Design a protein with these regions (language model features):
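A nucleotide-sugar donor-handling region in carbohydrate enzymes
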Residues: 127-217
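A short, charged/proline- and glycine-enriched loop
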Residues: 1-4, 91-93, 209-218, 222-223
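Short glycine-rich anion-binding loops that position phosphate/pyrophosphate groups of nucleotides
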Residues: 102, 223-225
Length: 233
Protein backbone atom coordinates (compact mmCIF):
# COMPACT_ATOMS: atom_id res chain seq x y z
CA UNK A 1 0.00 0.00 0.00
CA UNK A 2 1.17 3.52 -0.76
CA UNK A 3 2.03 5.92 2.08
CA UNK A 4 -0.46 8.55 3.18
CA UNK A 5 -0.06 12.31 3.11
CA UNK A 6 -0.98 14.28 6.23
CA UNK A 7 -1.19 18.10 6.13
CA UNK A 8 -1.03 19.78 9.55
CA UNK A 9 -1.46 23.36 10.75
CA UNK A 10 -1.40 22.89 14.56
CA UNK A 11 0.47 20.81 17.12
CA UNK A 12 -2.77 18.95 17.96
CA UNK A 13 -3.12 17.91 14.34
CA UNK A 14 0.50 16.74 14.31
CA UNK A 15 -0.16 14.64 17.41
CA UNK A 16 -3.19 12.78 16.10
CA UNK A 17 -1.76 12.32 12.61
CA UNK A 18 1.54 10.99 13.95
CA UNK A 19 -0.34 8.41 15.99
CA UNK A 20 -2.59 7.45 13.08
CA UNK A 21 0.36 7.21 10.72
CA UNK A 22 2.11 4.90 13.15
CA UNK A 23 -0.79 2.46 12.91
CA UNK A 24 -0.98 2.49 9.09
CA UNK A 25 1.03 0.37 6.69
CA UNK A 26 3.20 2.15 4.15
CA UNK A 27 5.60 3.91 6.52
CA UNK A 28 7.20 6.32 6.35
CA UNK A 29 4.22 8.49 5.51
CA UNK A 30 4.65 12.11 4.45
CA UNK A 31 3.64 14.91 6.82
CA UNK A 32 3.46 18.46 5.50
CA UNK A 33 3.97 20.99 8.27
CA UNK A 34 2.65 24.48 7.70
CA UNK A 35 4.87 27.26 9.00
CA UNK A 36 1.98 28.05 11.37
CA UNK A 37 3.04 25.07 13.53
CA UNK A 38 5.22 26.38 16.38
CA UNK A 39 8.98 25.65 16.29
CA UNK A 40 8.52 23.95 12.94
CA UNK A 41 12.09 23.01 12.05
CA UNK A 42 12.95 21.48 15.42
CA UNK A 43 9.64 19.62 15.54
CA UNK A 44 10.23 18.28 12.03
CA UNK A 45 13.61 16.85 13.06
CA UNK A 46 12.05 15.00 15.99
CA UNK A 47 9.23 13.70 13.79
CA UNK A 48 11.66 12.43 11.17
CA UNK A 49 13.60 10.59 13.89
CA UNK A 50 10.55 8.43 14.67
CA UNK A 51 10.67 6.73 11.27
CA UNK A 52 6.89 6.98 11.10
CA UNK A 53 6.78 10.10 8.94
CA UNK A 54 9.07 12.18 6.80
CA UNK A 55 8.31 15.86 6.98
CA UNK A 56 7.99 18.61 4.41
CA UNK A 57 7.96 22.24 5.55
CA UNK A 58 5.75 24.65 3.63
CA UNK A 59 5.54 28.39 4.28
CA UNK A 60 2.07 29.26 3.00
CA UNK A 61 2.64 32.98 3.48
CA UNK A 62 4.73 32.96 0.30
CA UNK A 63 1.52 32.44 -1.70
CA UNK A 64 -1.32 34.37 -0.06
CA UNK A 65 -3.18 35.24 -3.24
CA UNK A 66 -5.71 33.77 -5.65
CA UNK A 67 -5.96 33.54 -9.42
CA UNK A 68 -9.05 34.17 -11.55
CA UNK A 69 -9.86 33.77 -15.22
CA UNK A 70 -9.18 31.01 -17.73
CA UNK A 71 -7.59 27.86 -16.24
CA UNK A 72 -7.34 29.66 -12.90
CA UNK A 73 -6.85 26.48 -10.88
CA UNK A 74 -3.88 25.37 -12.98
CA UNK A 75 -2.22 28.77 -12.85
CA UNK A 76 -2.83 29.04 -9.10
CA UNK A 77 -1.29 25.60 -8.52
CA UNK A 78 1.81 26.51 -10.52
CA UNK A 79 2.17 29.79 -8.62
CA UNK A 80 1.95 27.95 -5.29
CA UNK A 81 4.55 25.38 -6.35
CA UNK A 82 6.97 28.05 -7.55
CA UNK A 83 6.70 30.25 -4.48
CA UNK A 84 6.27 27.62 -1.75
CA UNK A 85 8.71 25.07 -3.16
CA UNK A 86 6.55 21.96 -2.89
CA UNK A 87 4.61 20.07 -5.54
CA UNK A 88 1.98 17.42 -4.86
CA UNK A 89 2.25 14.08 -6.65
CA UNK A 90 -1.21 12.74 -5.86
CA UNK A 91 -0.50 9.34 -7.43
CA UNK A 92 2.24 8.72 -4.85
CA UNK A 93 -0.19 8.63 -1.91
CA UNK A 94 -2.94 6.30 -0.80
CA UNK A 95 -4.94 8.96 1.06
CA UNK A 96 -4.50 12.70 1.54
CA UNK A 97 -5.61 14.05 4.94
CA UNK A 98 -6.02 17.73 5.83
CA UNK A 99 -7.69 19.39 8.82
CA UNK A 100 -8.01 22.94 7.45
CA UNK A 101 -9.11 22.92 3.82
CA UNK A 102 -9.71 26.69 3.94
CA UNK A 103 -5.94 27.23 4.17
CA UNK A 104 -3.56 27.99 1.30
CA UNK A 105 -2.59 24.31 1.28
CA UNK A 106 -6.27 23.38 1.20
CA UNK A 107 -6.86 25.63 -1.78
CA UNK A 108 -3.83 24.08 -3.45
CA UNK A 109 -5.37 20.61 -3.05
CA UNK A 110 -8.52 21.92 -4.72
CA UNK A 111 -6.49 23.54 -7.51
CA UNK A 112 -4.80 20.17 -8.10
CA UNK A 113 -8.21 18.45 -8.15
CA UNK A 114 -6.73 16.12 -5.55
CA UNK A 115 -9.28 14.00 -3.72
CA UNK A 116 -8.73 14.53 -0.01
CA UNK A 117 -10.20 13.51 3.33
CA UNK A 118 -11.16 16.36 5.66
CA UNK A 119 -10.28 15.68 9.30
CA UNK A 120 -11.64 17.52 12.33
CA UNK A 121 -9.45 20.54 13.03
CA UNK A 122 -10.05 20.28 16.78
CA UNK A 123 -11.47 17.51 18.94
CA UNK A 124 -15.09 16.80 17.97
CA UNK A 125 -15.39 19.96 15.87
CA UNK A 126 -18.05 18.49 13.55
CA UNK A 127 -20.33 17.93 16.55
CA UNK A 128 -20.36 21.48 17.90
CA UNK A 129 -23.66 23.39 18.09
CA UNK A 130 -22.45 26.32 15.97
CA UNK A 131 -21.76 25.35 12.35
CA UNK A 132 -22.56 28.73 10.78
CA UNK A 133 -19.46 28.70 8.57
CA UNK A 134 -20.83 25.70 6.68
CA UNK A 135 -24.46 26.80 6.62
CA UNK A 136 -23.60 30.37 5.58
CA UNK A 137 -21.41 29.06 2.78
CA UNK A 138 -24.26 26.95 1.43
CA UNK A 139 -26.65 29.91 1.23
CA UNK A 140 -24.22 32.12 -0.69
CA UNK A 141 -25.27 33.10 -4.21
CA UNK A 142 -22.20 31.53 -5.82
CA UNK A 143 -22.38 28.20 -3.97
CA UNK A 144 -23.71 26.21 -6.94
CA UNK A 145 -21.03 27.57 -9.27
CA UNK A 146 -18.32 26.69 -6.77
CA UNK A 147 -19.71 23.17 -6.50
CA UNK A 148 -18.96 22.87 -10.21
CA UNK A 149 -15.35 23.83 -9.57
CA UNK A 150 -15.51 27.58 -10.22
CA UNK A 151 -13.76 28.77 -7.08
CA UNK A 152 -13.16 27.27 -3.66
CA UNK A 153 -15.43 25.66 -1.09
CA UNK A 154 -14.31 24.86 2.42
CA UNK A 155 -15.17 22.76 5.51
CA UNK A 156 -15.90 19.64 3.46
CA UNK A 157 -18.14 21.15 0.75
CA UNK A 158 -15.53 21.11 -2.01
CA UNK A 159 -16.23 18.63 -4.84
CA UNK A 160 -12.65 17.45 -4.33
CA UNK A 161 -13.30 16.44 -0.72
CA UNK A 162 -14.06 12.73 -0.95
CA UNK A 163 -14.83 12.06 2.73
CA UNK A 164 -15.33 13.94 5.99
CA UNK A 165 -14.19 12.53 9.32
CA UNK A 166 -16.08 12.99 12.57
CA UNK A 167 -15.62 11.88 16.14
CA UNK A 168 -19.06 10.28 15.72
CA UNK A 169 -20.39 10.26 12.16
CA UNK A 170 -23.83 9.07 13.29
CA UNK A 171 -24.28 12.33 15.24
CA UNK A 172 -23.04 14.67 12.52
CA UNK A 173 -25.83 16.07 10.35
CA UNK A 174 -23.73 18.37 8.15
CA UNK A 175 -23.16 15.87 5.35
CA UNK A 176 -24.82 12.84 3.81
CA UNK A 177 -24.05 9.53 5.49
CA UNK A 178 -22.20 8.17 2.46
CA UNK A 179 -19.59 10.95 2.77
CA UNK A 180 -19.04 10.57 6.51
CA UNK A 181 -16.59 8.33 8.32
CA UNK A 182 -16.08 7.94 12.06
CA UNK A 183 -12.53 8.38 13.30
CA UNK A 184 -12.58 8.75 17.07
CA UNK A 185 -9.59 10.59 18.49
CA UNK A 186 -10.87 9.85 22.00
CA UNK A 187 -10.60 6.11 21.33
CA UNK A 188 -7.22 6.63 19.69
CA UNK A 189 -5.79 8.48 22.68
CA UNK A 190 -7.34 6.04 25.15
CA UNK A 191 -5.73 3.06 23.39
CA UNK A 192 -2.11 4.22 23.23
CA UNK A 193 0.52 1.59 23.89
CA UNK A 194 3.60 2.23 26.01
CA UNK A 195 5.68 2.49 22.82
CA UNK A 196 3.30 5.06 21.35
CA UNK A 197 3.36 7.11 24.56
CA UNK A 198 7.16 7.03 24.52
CA UNK A 199 7.17 8.23 20.90
CA UNK A 200 4.86 11.12 21.77
CA UNK A 201 7.13 12.13 24.65
CA UNK A 202 10.20 12.09 22.40
CA UNK A 203 8.49 14.32 19.86
CA UNK A 204 6.64 16.81 22.04
CA UNK A 205 8.55 17.05 25.34
CA UNK A 206 11.58 19.28 24.97
CA UNK A 207 12.44 19.18 28.68
CA UNK A 208 11.77 16.68 31.49
CA UNK A 209 8.43 16.81 33.24
CA UNK A 210 8.60 17.95 36.88
CA UNK A 211 8.61 15.14 39.41
CA UNK A 212 6.02 16.98 41.50
CA UNK A 213 3.03 18.43 39.65
CA UNK A 214 0.89 19.51 42.60
CA UNK A 215 -1.16 22.55 41.66
CA UNK A 216 -0.51 22.18 37.94
CA UNK A 217 -3.13 23.68 35.62
CA UNK A 218 -4.37 22.20 32.36
CA UNK A 219 -5.37 24.80 29.76
CA UNK A 220 -7.78 23.50 27.12
CA UNK A 221 -8.13 25.28 23.75
CA UNK A 222 -11.92 25.12 23.79
CA UNK A 223 -14.77 24.32 26.17
CA UNK A 224 -14.77 20.54 26.36
CA UNK A 225 -17.19 20.67 29.30
CA UNK A 226 -19.74 22.75 27.39
CA UNK A 227 -19.43 20.45 24.38
CA UNK A 228 -20.19 17.43 26.52
CA UNK A 229 -16.79 15.93 25.81
CA UNK A 230 -15.49 16.13 29.38
CA UNK A 231 -17.22 16.18 32.75
CA UNK A 232 -16.53 18.65 35.53
CA UNK A 233 -15.09 15.76 37.55
Amino acid sequence: MKPNLYICHTAYQVLVDLLRAGRCVGKPHTMVLSASVPDTAALAARLDATGVVKTVLVDETRWPGTVTGLFAHRRAARAFEKLCGWKLNRAAFENVYIHNDWSVLGRYLQDCRAGYILCEDTFGSTLGPDQHLVTDQRTAADFAAKQRGKGYLYWGDSPWCVRVESEDAARCTLFSADRMVTDSKAKLLESLTDDEKAMVRRVFLTQPLPEKADGATLLLPRSFVADGLMTQA
